[in-house]
């Protein structure tokens, strides 16, 4: 999917105060009316949910999270906690995007097929509960990105994107989260487990489970060796092995000995092939 032209999105509110940005977002949410927020527990959807509860009241808002093998168990637990903090009802929808052969093929547009399945399920929930709209945490930077196939599914289903619609960038989202004192205001982005699998490597339930085990093993090892980590990914590269990506501070703190032990711990989790470490780069295996 090509990036949307800047002319199709409103001016950024990046330089507004948090209070001004909040006023604009709340006004937009009031115009949308009762809705379901497609929720992940991350900062983007949490800001939309927090704003919706403030603008419409908890009785007019529902949060929904798609639960499938691509969702790490820690992320599901986090989403339950955050929804509870915001006073919103959270509905867990079991989805089976992995049953779609186009999703499993992982040919570069996997996110489209995933979002189509997930958002169709959320739209069905909205209809059953008598809520007029579904909203996502898509922000202006997402719309400007070069490769966001999932946005096509959202457009096809007429899902609203209140953050992007008011011109909120990721920086503004963080500012709003701090303004509302959300517990996830500094939470790193945590996309689905399938995002760790290189394009062309089939996405299966077993491979998704392997990614989750590998990241838990890697995180545990680094904690044991007192290496603070903000961003951690274990990328599966098919015949090329795997790559562990860490934020720069963590990468700098990893000694030669710790590096060897980390790669061995990941191999013990069942990941085979040549392993390497690199600086974390968001979307380095975009699909």
Report the location of each language-model feature.
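Short, flexible, solvent-exposed loop/turn segments with mixed acidic/basic and small polar residues
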Residues: 149-152, 232-236
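Generic alpha-helical secondary structure
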Residues: 119, 207-215, 251, 255-259
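A short interface-forming secondary-structure element
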Residues: 236-257
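Mid-to-C-terminal catalytic subdomains of enzymes
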Residues: 164-231, 277
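ATP-dependent adenylation/nucleotidyltransferase module used to activate substrates
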Residues: 2-179, 242, 260-275, 279-283, ...
């Amino acid at each position: 999917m090509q990036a949307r032209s800047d002319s199709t999105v409103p001016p950024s509110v990046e330089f507004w105060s948090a209070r001004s940005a909040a006023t604009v977002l709340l006004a937009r949410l009031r115009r949308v009316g009762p809705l379901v927020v497609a929720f992940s527990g991350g900062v983007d959807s949490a800001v939309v949910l927090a704003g919706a509860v403030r603008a419409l009241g908890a009785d007019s808002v529902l949060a929904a999270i798609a639960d499938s093998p691509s969702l790490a168990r820690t992320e599901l637990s986090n989403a339950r906690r955050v929804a509870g903090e915001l006073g919103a009802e959270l509905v867990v929808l079991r989805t089976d995007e992995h049953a779609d052969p186009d999703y499993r093929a992982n040919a570069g547009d996997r996110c489209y097929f995933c979002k189509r399945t997930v958002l169709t399920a959320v739209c069905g929930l909205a209809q059953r509960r008598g809520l007029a709209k579904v909203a996502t945490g898509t922000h202006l930077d997402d719309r400007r990105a070069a490769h966001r196939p999932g946005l096509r599914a959202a457009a096809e289903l007429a899902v609203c994107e209140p953050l992007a619609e008011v011109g909120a960038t990721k920086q503004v989202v963080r500012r709003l989260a701090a303004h509302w004192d959300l517990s996830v205001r500094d939470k790193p982005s945590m996309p689905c487990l399938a995002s760790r699998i290189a394009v062309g490597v089939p996405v299966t339930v077993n491979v998704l489970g392997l990614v989750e085990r590998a990241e838990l093993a890697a995180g545990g090892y680094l904690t044991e060796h007192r290496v603070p980590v903000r961003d951690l990914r274990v990328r599966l590269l098919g015949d090329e092995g795997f790559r562990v990506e860490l934020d720069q501070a963590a990468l700098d703190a990893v000694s030669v000995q710790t590096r060897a032990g980390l790669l061995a711990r990941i191999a013990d989790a069942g990941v085979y092939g040549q392993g390497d470490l690199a600086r974390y780069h968001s979307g380095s295996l975009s699909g």
